[in-house]
Amino acid sequence: MSKPLPRKLFVTTALPYANGAFHVGHIMEYIQADIWVRFQRMQGNEVHFVGADDAHGAPIMIAAEKAGLTPQQFVANIAAGRKQYLDGFHIEFDNWSSTDSPENHELSREIYRRLRDDAKLITTKSVEQFYDPVKEMFLPDRYIKGECPKCGTKDQYGDSCENCSAVYAPTDLKHPYSTLTGATPVRKSSDHFFFRLSDPKCVAFLREWALDGQRLQSEVANKAKEWLEGEGGLGDWDISRDAPYFGIEIPDAPGKYFYVWLDAPVGYLATLKNYFDKTGRDFDAFMADPSTEQYHFIGKDITYFHTLFWPAMLKFADMKVPNNVFVHGFITVSGEKMSKSRGTGISPLRYLEIGMNPEWLRYYIAAKLSSKVEDIDFTSDDFIARVNSDLIGKYINIASRAAGFITKKFDGRVATDWATSDDAFLSRLRNVASEIQALYDQREYGKALRAIMEQADAINAYVDANKPWELAKDPAKEAALQEVCSRLLEAFRILTIYLKPVLPALAKQVEAQLNIAPLEWHHIITPLPHGHQINPYVHLMTRVEPKMLDALFDMPALVDATVGVPTSPSNKDGDTNGNGHAIESIAPEIKIDDFAKIDLRIAKIVNCEHVEGSDKLLRLTLDVGEGRMRNVFSGIKSAYKPEDLIGKLTVMVANLAPRKMKFGISEGMVLAASAADEKANPGIYILNPWPGAEPGMRVG
C-alpha cells in the first residue's frame, strides 16, 4: 500500500456568530470537519484547518451596548470562551481569528474594489428600508420579523425564511414588526450598494460551477438549480448597511458598511492569511497555486450564501473559487429541534462539566453522519447502546482480552513470527483499508464505522474461537497463547488506525499502551515487530451510564424544561430585586399575538410521585378540566415533596406539544420561578393561584 501523492487542502467550517457560546450544532459541524481533516493528514496530505468568529453586525453592536462594552470588547469576551469547547472535544483548528481582524478589513475592501472597478458588478440603488420610530434607527434584517412572502410562514426574519429558504428584502415581509420594540416599522429611503448577481456572466458561471454534477451534493445542486431557474431568476444582492453599524466601512462611501454576509465568508481567507503571516507562509502564493483545494463545511441553513454569492464574489474578484461546499443537516434530540425552553438542547459545556467522555459524542455523531444533507437525531437510549456496544463491547474488549496475558506471561513482548497459514485473519482486516479510506474521504462516516465494526465483530469471533483464557490454563500451550494474543493486539492496532480520525485521544492512549509512534494510515501494513514490548495494560474507556444522560438533560438552568425558570443564570445588566438579588434581564418585547399563542390553564395536582432513576424529576398527574388526566414531568424534586403537592392548584402550559422523555410522555409544562443567581437563592417556586380558581380556567 503506497502513500498517495500529497494534496494541499484549505478547510473551514462556518463562522459562528460572536454573540454567544457554542451550541451542539456548532460542535457537530466542527467534529465532522475535524474528522475529515485528521483523516487527510493521516494520508500525508498538507491541510490548513482554520476558523474565526463572525464578529460584525447590528446584533453584536446592540448586545455590546446593552452590556456596557465596545463591540470589540464584547467579541473578545465571547472569543475567550471558545477554547474550552474546542479543546474539550479534541477539535484542532490551526488558527482561530475574527472577521474584525486587519486581514479581513483589507481583503474585504480589496474584493469589493475588484468587483466594483474590474468586474463592474457593483451598482447603487435607492432602497426603502424599515426604520424603527421608537429606537430611531434603520432596522437590520434580523431585527425585523413578519410573514414570509413566499410560503407564508409567520415570524420569519427580514432576510431569509427558515422554512422554505427563500431570500428576500425586509420590505417584502408581510405584517412586519420590530423585534427591538414591537413597533410597526416605517419606510425610509437610503442609497445602497448591490452586487449584481443577476448579471448574465454571474448566472452563466454559477450554472457551470453549481450544476456540473461533479461538485455539490445532489440535494444542494437541485436547490441551486431551483434558485437559478426559478421565477425571476437571481436577484441582485444588497451588500451595504447604514450607520450606526459595527462592521467594515465601504471604500469611498462614508457612513456605509458592508453587510455582514459580505465580509463573513471573506473571513475564511483572512484567518488563513493571519495564520500564514504568523508562520511565515506566503498566502498569495498558496491561494494562487492551482493544486490548492478549498473546502467549506456548512449547515443547510446558509446554503444560498455559500453556493451563489460566495463563489460568484470570488470568481469575479479574480480569486480562487471553492472546490466544494459540504452541507450537513441539523441535530435533533429525540426527534425534536433543539430548544432551551423545551429542554431539548444538549449543552456541550454541560456535557464536559459532568465528566462525559468527549469521544463518546465524537463517535456517536460520526456514526450518524453521511454525505447527504440529512438531520441526525440524538436519543439517550441509542447513545448509550451504540457507545457501549461498539466502543466498549467490540473495540476496547479486544485489547482488554489480550494485553493482560502478554504482560503477565510474556514480559509484555509480542510474537509475530507467525505461520503463513494463518495470515488470512489479518489480511482480511487489512484488505478493507481502501474501502474505509474511500468512505472517510467521501464523508460517509456512518458507513465507515459500520465497516470497521464488522471487522471488530470478526476479531471478537476469533477471540471466542481461540479462547485465550483457556489456553492460559495449560502451560503446554503458552506459545499458542502468545501467538493468539499477539494477533489480537495487531488487529487492535489496525482498528485503532481506522478509528483514529474519530477517536484521536483514545488513539494516543493506545499508542502509549502499545509503545509505538503516532499511527499513520500507511502503518496498516507494517505489523508490530517480533519481540516488541508493550506497556502494562491500563483501562482505556469506561461505559456510558444512564445517570450521566439524566444529568446531561436535567440541567439546573432548565429544570428539565417542564418548569418555566430562567435559561441563563447570567445578569449582564446588573439589575436587582427588592432583596438585592440579581434578576435575569427582561426578554425582548413580544406582540400580544405572540402571547396569545400560549394557552395557560389552572391545573389541579391529582397525584404526584417520585420518578425512579431521576434526581430532579417529579411525575405529576394533572386535571385541567378537560375530562382526562395529564401526565407531566417537572424538575422540582429538590424543592417539593410529592405529598405536599397533591390536591394543590397550579398553572400549566396546556397547548405545548407532548414531549417524549426517557421516563414517559410529558403533556405540558408546569410553571415555576427561580432566581437568576442560584447561589443567592437556590429555591424553585411553583405557581399557585388564589382561592376560587378552578381546573380548566384560562390564565391571561
From Swiss-Prot:
Domain tRNA-binding: 594-700
Top-rank taxon, per record: Bacteria
Catalysed reactions listed for this entry: tRNA(Met) + L-methionine + ATP = L-methionyl-tRNA(Met) + AMP + diphosphate
Cysteines joined through disulfide linkages: none
Tagged with keyword Transferase: no
Keyword annotations from UniProtKB, A to Z: Aminoacyl-tRNA synthetase, ATP-binding, Cytoplasm, Ligase, Metal-binding, Nucleotide-binding, Protein biosynthesis, RNA-binding, tRNA-binding, Zinc
PANTHER family on file: METHIONINE--TRNA LIGASE, METHIONINE--TRNA LIGASE, CYTOPLASMIC
Assembly information from the UniProt record: Homodimer.
The name this protein goes by in its record: Methionine--tRNA ligase
Species in which this protein is naturally found: Janthinobacterium sp. (strain Marseille)
